[in-house]
Amino acid sequence: MSDLFAKLMDQIEMPLDMRRSSAFSSADIIEVKVHSVSRLWEFHFAFAAVLPIATYRELHDRLIRTFEAADIKVTFDIQAAQVDYSDDLLQAYYQEAFEHAPCNSASFKSSFSKLKVTYEDDKLIIAAPGFVNNDHFRNNHLPNLVKQFEAFGFGTLTIDMVSDQEMTEHLTKDFVSSRQALVKKAVQDNLEAQKSLEAMMPPVEEATPAPKFDYKERAAKRQAGFEKATITPMIEIETEENRIVFEGMVFDVERKTTRTGRHIINFKMTDYTSSFALQKWAKDDEELRKFDMIAKGAWLRVQGNIETNPFTKSLTMNVQQVKEIVHHERKDLMPEGQKRVELHAHTNMSTMDALPTVESLIDTAAKWGHKAVAITDHANVQSFPHGYHRARKAGIKAIFGLEANIVEDKVPISYDPVDMDLHEATYVVFDVETTGLSAMNNDLIQIAASKMFKGNIVEQFDEFIDPGHPLSAFTTELTGITDKHLQGAKPLVTVLKAFQDFCKDSILVAHNASFDVGFMNANYERHDLPKITQPVIDTLEFARNLYPEYKRHGLGPLTKRFQVSLDHHHMANYDAEATGRLLFIFLKDAREKHGIKNLLQLNTDLVAEDSYKKARIKHATIYVQNQVGLKNMFKLVSLSNIKYFEGVPRIPRTVLDAHREGLLLGTACSDGEVFDAVLTKGIDAAVDLAKYYDFIEIMPPAIYQPLVVRELIKDQAGIEQVIRDLIEVGKRANKLVLATGNVHYLEPEEEIYREIIVRSLGQGAMINRTIGRGEGAQPAPLPKAHFRTTNEMLDEFAFLGKDLAYQVVVENTQDFADRIEEVEVVKGDLYTPYIDKAEETVAELTYQKAFEIYGNPLPDIIDLRIEKELTSILGNGFAVIYLASQMLVNRSNERGYLVGSRGSVGSSFVATMIGITEVNPMPPHYVCPSCQHSEFITDGSVGSGYDLPNKPCPKCGTPYQKDGQDIPFETFLGFDGDKVPDIDLNFSGDDQPSAHLDVRDIFGAEYAFRAGTVGTVAEKTAYGFVKGYERDYGKFYRDAEVDRLAAGAAGVKRTTGQHPGGIVVIPNYMDVYDFTPVQYPADDVTASWQTTHFNFHDIDENVLKLDILGHDDPTMIRKLQDLSGIDPITIPADDPGVMALFSGTEVLGVTPEQIGTPTGMLGIPEFGTNFVRGMVNETHPTTFAELLQLSGLSHGTDVWLGNAQDLIKEGIATLKTVIGCRDDIMVYLMHAGLEPKMAFTIMERVRKGLWLKISEEERNGYIDAMRENNVPDWYIESCGKIKYMFPKAHAAAYVLMALRVAYFKVHHPIMYYCAYFSIRAKAFELKTMSGGLDAVKARMEDITIKRKNNEATNVENDLFTTLEIVNEMLERGFKFGKLDLYKSDAIEFQIKGDTLIPPFIALEGLGENVAKQIVKARQEGEFLSKMELRKRGGASSTLVEKMDEMGILGNMPEDNQLSLFDDFF
């Protein structure tokens, strides 16, 4: 018994008789861990044997009682030198296990504690009845039981449960007989009670009233019971139970109201053991308000009955009582000024690796009182913008960094080369076998070498080395070396000296030489022997550079490829000999193919420029110290993604050196080169490497724990020694040593989310390393990487001593943070590109067009509007944005395409005048195309100029032109005209690529980039990850827990992408690195465009962003123009035939019954959907203004349903008077008499859904003003319901395009149908479409039935839309022809009289390339056979068969018979 242990026994007054037992003979205290914050002491004891159960209980109870008096919690575990597996002792400890958490849970204890155990076949066997859930036991309880037995001193005990049939039958029999006896007794008792009751019952008239029931008293008792009730962990609930109490956090809430007016709150809670679905009913609104505390993020105590939900079929708690509880969050308890700074933290922008948003990371650090926190995501800086804004808001310094992948530019083939003829040299080709990868923690067990000259082995060296301990199973499995091999082996130092003698005057050769040489040098250093100084050739790098076309360059694949014998891979003698044979093959090829004859040439002439692609990656943390450093960081990120990307973004060391100004460099994690050197090469080597860095990082031992499992470090003591070595490295290299946390999530319980994300990557991912080989491989554990408080970090490093721990955790991290300057990540102003004379050009183009239309001098209303807009546009530097948009639109127009506008740009009259948009925002007006005389209607009586009656100019008699949609300029650039303009344009999808290239041409390729996006894991995808994790790792989660885990795993960065039409333009007097790094979308280095590294939204207020979107409408208009020769600009917006489509079908020559709809809206953009067709049927629009209203109502949120629809139905308002588009609010209120500023503000509040969110005082002020100006109450109430509104300019542009398309449907129908099917239709079924009306209607009916049963597929839903148009076309008397092998086009539908001929691409499964190939092949000659169609046309057998079935091929033979006789003619 050790003195320390004896002293402890004295303190707890352990009985002397127990102390004298043999088990206590060598008792000792291995370690005591003291957690100062939680006041927990962990004792680790060593005993000669497992303690008798009575002794164990006495020790346990006395330890607990003694320390409890000092308010200290105690836990302990035992390591026993000898273990007694007798059944009696195991049975006693088995029952004892259920007295310790977590095995003492009520359900586990009651179900399992009374079972019998035995020890058989090296296993603890639990005999259980057959109805026990074995899977649940294995998944939820077995791990805890194993850990408890290990703590008792039994070591890692294998525990299994078997079904005991005899026990099952016995318990079943007892249950049945017991139940029968109870039923019999209950019946008898009931009869006797009835007789006694009748005998005792007094006459009725003498009955006394029952005492009044005290409901308040009962409620108070229930509440008291609720307060004191035992909390049940959610994981324990497996069946229906009553009066269960949970405590946990709400993570999902949904409130519903039934038809009867009752309310139901469906919510989900978690206590982090599992999660549960719960329900709470409320009879009315008043009762519902009592449960406002049921909100997302709230911590509650709830009581209720667990029942199976009949709809979800899962266990659900019907809540009876609920109260909010205080949740004690982790806090940093260190005093102000003594708190650490976290300098290594990942956010959810670390691809598929970390969880916290940068906002939550910064908020947590600020809440804990930390003065700074660093962001160090893997190889990207996409969290910087949000981190910058959040840190400023939180009043904390954000340190901007990243964890980079550093590689050597050129990985040498030869180390320390000299001038030597390779053909005349002597080589020692060697290999070592070790017990692990760490030269400092693992041992050499074999050194073997072949000395070779001119390809011949002239001498061999082969020695085993006894490491002084048994080999692990993994080492033996990997190397084939057993303990028997090592018996009688020479001492290590003897073998090392002999090997050095063996290597004299030779070039050393090894495969992956950096490992072998590093291991040898570390051992030489340890034994005061000289390190390797002679030249070394690495055959791994030799092969990579000599044979870059090979995918694998390992020893095994290379020996197979070159047919070199390798009988026992991973035994040093065999590996060395095989490597030698390969060496001389390589030397021969290098000489013959590359002229390599001298050792010096290997590095100078053979190492490839792109050898960095194969170089081993080392992590380093890089931090921005100042503004210069920020720009350099952006350059490094860009270069790593654009120029040096290979699997991951890489930064070659010389590139880092060239951009190091303003940056600070840290050694990062266990994947850093300094840590690796400490582990594999020794402190001296690590010191040399550390000189390159600005500071050394050390991390909590828990972060390095996976290295123990991977056998890179022996144990906890080994981890602590590595940390001490790193501190020593810092001391010798004169570098600051900082303790960092390698944060990947914030709270300890969030570990499971990262586990799920990482495991979803599969075993091929580096982060998802495995232990073991083959089918037995298991995933390596992930480190405990939560955000630690200062106290927790000090506990982690307590082994260093109080002062040193405080220095590395607090003082040094604060010192480093003070060296970081504040930087501006996101600029505060807009920086537009420069175009020479942009302001003058915009003004000139505006007035030029205005004079052309309205005359010179201009009408006052036009002149004032232009002056107002130009003052804002030119004064705020927006002219270049207007001019750039005008240039792009003009170029597309010159290529023959119209460009539609989106959003509010049509609110700008200047935009109209310079040709950016067709929408004219002036009040409705007439203007004469001959003499420019004009008339404006400004009283609001007309909604659109297109609705004005036709009339001639009173001055010259020329028919007036009509225009004007009455849209205020404020809706585009804000009331003060200083909002950055967002000009969105709809280009034809066919012309979009050309428009994108126009941007490059105008501004320069080095200033134009696609707008980057970041794609994160969606909750549905995360749900799939959770289910996959369940499947792969034998887990079982209830539905609520799956939902929680999916929500926790969602939001992590998965990939990058690009906006479909967004292009960011950098000002030509700056460069892109002033704003953002750049990269390729989705890491596709073959992409033609680079994107912004930042999500474009993060910088859209700093640089010009052009939205050049592809749209079907301009494409369709161009197609119709090509077919008809009609200029779409000349199509009137008030054509009577077109307007008739909105009220009936007569203009199409069909009845509603024929086409299945009461109007002619099918296939008309904006109005062809079922939803909008329903709106048309209800409102019967007759004017362009009313169509604008419909467009606004259909695109808004809570504008039509439950709002305008009801007002129109009830006759309170009309389609004309309801609120439709956002701009109408401002115009209407101004006409009503409100001040423009207030009218604008009300419009802004309503359109953004803020009406009910602003203060009651502000809202009442607006309401009073509206009522004072006779705005009706229904209008005010309608404002309060709106969540989002559509801009009128957007609606006007879309409706105008729609009416042009509709014009062709009415007046040129076959052209319309040709364009529709060529451009808009998404799905085809040619057999049906060319089968006539009956076939089309039958298929539509079939899909309709499927839709009613929710069985229709997405393809069928798209097909139904297509068939509606086919049906209409056929009913109008046109025909749908069959696919024609010699007449059909590859892509476009063709018009042949009154018939449409479909293209090849319309055939299901036939792609564009094959379609074009068939057309090309038929131009070369007729297809003589199906075989020829397949061969020359590129059609698959399936496609040819499908064509044959449809009658397209006629009597075409299978193959060309004449070809059999070609040789005879």
From Swiss-Prot:
Organism from which the protein derives: Streptococcus pyogenes serotype M4 (strain MGAS10750)
MF annotations from Gene Ontology: 3'-5' exonuclease activity; DNA binding; DNA-directed DNA polymerase activity
Protein name per the record: DNA polymerase III PolC-type
One Pfam family it belongs to: PHP
Entry function: Required for replicative DNA synthesis. This DNA polymerase also exhibits 3' to 5' exonuclease activity.
Disulfide topology: none
GO biological process, one term: DNA-templated DNA replication
Cellular component terms per the entry's GO annotation: cytoplasm
CDD domains xrefs: DEDDh (cd06127), PHP_PolIIIA_POLC (cd07435), polC_OBF (cd04484)
The keyword Cytoplasm appears for this protein: yes
Gene3D superfamilies per the UniProt record, alphabetical: 1.10.150.870, 3.30.1900.20, 6.10.140.1510, Metal-dependent hydrolases, Nucleic acid-binding proteins, PolC, middle finger domain, Ribonuclease H-like superfamily/Ribonuclease H
Domain Exonuclease: 427-583
Family matches, as HAMAP family: DNApol_PolC
UniProt-listed PANTHER family: DNA POLYMERASE III POLC-TYPE, DNA POLYMERASE III SUBUNIT ALPHA
Taxonomy, superkingdom: Bacteria
Coiled-coil regions, chain positions: none
Keywords assigned: Cytoplasm, DNA replication, DNA-directed DNA polymerase, Exonuclease, Hydrolase, Nuclease, Nucleotidyltransferase, Transferase
Catalytic activity: DNA(n) + a 2'-deoxyribonucleoside 5'-triphosphate = DNA(n+1) + diphosphate
EC class name: transferase
Enzyme Commission code: 2.7.7.7
Family, similarity comment: Belongs to the DNA polymerase type-C family. PolC subfamily.
Entries under NCBIfam families matching the protein: dnaq (TIGR00573), polC_Gram_pos (TIGR01405), PRK00448.1 (NF001688)
Family matches, as SMART domains: EXOIII, POLIIIAc
Localization, UniProt: Cytoplasm
